[in-house]
């Protein structure tokens, strides 16, 4: 008799965005004429920039000629892309990385979910609340979560509330934790940490021999110079932090798939006798076993982001989305909503009016304004009573959606 992995049975009925899609489809079926504007799931609407498209076409042409064809590539990524990542994203900020400390992948969602595989099942996991669901669900699947309780949380996971009272910024755990998931700029709240605030987390991790799993997928959207773009700007972070980055939102790679993870050789985990093991080597071992690398045309396209033309074009795309964020944020404030985020991130986190639940606000928004967003409760218990809108729509739809919210809600 084949037994099921019972950890999967602890998961909520469906993934958040699958449930949203189900409800939207249900509404469309009942209202086929409705003009629905989607400001929910964080998919992009701007196309790949010309520099990226040209590089990908060139790479595809190379794959069609015997003398330039490439088969299996290195699991860790091609040196031409890794070198550009280090030279452009890290060196200008005074961060020195080795070529073997950067791992190219097909998405930061995959990496943030998979990285826990090389860490012990007995580790205590801490997540901010609200939180990107993947951090929690992947640890539930692995068996670190304990039971799902009546509060909508898992017994063995430490939740760090981000509330209006603490400015949507998590406080250090009261007890020791081993694995700390941080995402800044934050999904879903759109908030950021200063260097001083981030240093507290690095210091905590160093004191407790914890590991910070730092999701910096939205760093390219940071507008304020004093906000850190990498956790490695903080002294000592190389000893305790793994950083995840993505080209998905930065350069429109949601359908192309390319990201990278930085694992400094100094980051250690320990066995029961206290012997230290470098996570860099363990992650390499995991990747060479379970991952065949990102395709050559996609990596060539990603490298084009770092050309002079690519940088200029991607910057224009980011500015486009951040103008959308400004429109959403200012429009909601004018309409009387309490809002967070939208300054250094493409996400706007709003407080629902009149103590309305997140899902009730979702239903009202789609039925009255024909606008789709993401219920805060889907990101955790502390997200109840809040709602996320994204800046990844078209300008026309963003303006139209805010006008509907102002006049119909």
From Swiss-Prot:
User: Where do the annotations place pyridoxal 5'-phosphate binding?
Assistant: 72, 108-109, 132, 187, 218, 246-248, 257, 292
The protein's required cofactor(s) are namely: pyridoxal 5'-phosphate
Query: Which keywords does this chain's UniProt record carry?
Result: Aminotransferase, Pyridoxal phosphate, Transferase
UniProt GO BP = lysine biosynthetic process via diaminopimelate, diaminopimelate-aminotransferase pathway
Kind of enzyme, top EC level?
transferase
CDD domains registered for this protein in UniProt: AAT_like (cd00609)
Instruction: List residues, modification N6-(pyridoxal phosphate)lysine.
Output: 249
Q: Which residues bind substrate?
A: 15, 42, 109, 132, 187, 292, 388
Q: Which GO terms describe its molecular function?
A: L,L-diaminopimelate aminotransferase activity; pyridoxal phosphate binding
Enumerate the catalysed reactions. Answer: (2S,6S)-2,6-diaminopimelate + 2-oxoglutarate = (S)-2,3,4,5-tetrahydrodipicolinate + L-glutamate + H2O + H(+)
Pfam families, sorted: Aminotran_1_2
Segments spanning the bilayer are: none
Per the record, the pathway is: Amino-acid biosynthesis; L-lysine biosynthesis via DAP pathway; LL-2,6-diaminopimelate from (S)-tetrahydrodipicolinate (aminotransferase route): step 1/1
Q: What is its EC number?
A: 2.6.1.83
Q: What does this protein do?
A: Involved in the synthesis of meso-diaminopimelate (m-DAP or DL-DAP), required for both lysine and peptidoglycan biosynthesis. Catalyzes the direct conversion of tetrahydrodipicolinate to LL-diaminopimelate.
What HAMAP family does this protein's entry cite? DapL_aminotrans_1
Q: Which family does it belong to?
A: Belongs to the class-I pyridoxal-phosphate-dependent aminotransferase family. LL-diaminopimelate aminotransferase subfamily.
SUBUNIT field: Homodimer.
Put simply, this protein is called LL-diaminopimelate aminotransferase
Q: What is the lineage of its organism?
A: Bacteria, Bacillati, Bacillota, Clostridia, Eubacteriales
- This chain is encoded by the gene named dapL
């Amino acid at each position: 008799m084949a037994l099921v992995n019972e950890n999967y049975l602890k998961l909520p009925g469906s993934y958040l965005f699958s449930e949203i899609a189900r409800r939207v489809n249900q509404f469309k079926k009942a209202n086929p004429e409705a003009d629905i504007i989607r400001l929910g799931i964080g998919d992009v609407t701007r196309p790949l920039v010309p520099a990226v498209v040209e590089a990908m076409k060139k790479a595809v042409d190379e794959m069609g000629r015997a003398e330039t064809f490439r088969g299996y590539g290195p699991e860790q990524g091609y040196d031409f892309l890794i070198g550009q990542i280090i030279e452009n994203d890290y060196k200008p900020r005074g961060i020195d990385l080795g070529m073997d400390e950067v791992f190219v992948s097909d998405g930061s969602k995959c990496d943030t979910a998979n990285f826990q595989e090389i860490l012990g099942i007995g580790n205590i996991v801490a997540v901010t609340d609200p939180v990107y669901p993947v951090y929690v669900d992947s640890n539930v699947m692995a068996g670190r979560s304990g039971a799902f309780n009546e509060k909508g949380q898992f017994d063995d996971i430490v939740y760090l509330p981000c509330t209006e009272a603490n400015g949507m910024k998590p406080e250090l755990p009261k007890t020791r934790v081993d694995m700390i998931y941080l995402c800044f700029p934050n999904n879903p709240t759109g908030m950021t940490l200063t260097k001083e605030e981030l240093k507290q987390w690095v210091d905590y991790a160093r004191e407790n021999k914890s590991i910070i799993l730092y999701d910096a997928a939205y760093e390219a959207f940071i507008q304020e110079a004093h906000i850190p773009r990498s956790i490695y700007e903080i002294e000592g972070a190389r000893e305790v932090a793994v950083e995840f980055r993505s080209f998905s939102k930065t350069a429109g790679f949601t359908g192309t798939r390319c990201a990278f993870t930085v694992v400094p050789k100094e980051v250690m985990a320990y066995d029961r006798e206290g012997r230290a093991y470098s996570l860099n080597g363990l992650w390499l071992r995991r990747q060479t076993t379970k991952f065949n690398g990102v395709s050559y045309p996609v990596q060539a396209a990603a490298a084009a982001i770092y050309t002079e033309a690519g940088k200029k074009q991607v910057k224009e795309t980011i500015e486009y989305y951040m103008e959308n964020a400004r429109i959403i944020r200012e429009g909601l404030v004018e309409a009387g909503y309490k809002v967070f985020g939208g300054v250094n991130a493409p996400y706007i986190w709003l407080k629902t009016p009149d103590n309305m639940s997140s899902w009730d606000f979702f239903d009202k928004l789609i039925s009255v304004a024909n606008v789709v967003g993401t219920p805060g409760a889907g990101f955790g218990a502390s997200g109840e009573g809040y709602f996320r809108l994204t800046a990844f729509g078209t300008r026309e739809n963003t303006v139209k959606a805010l006008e509907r919210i102002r006049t119909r809600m």
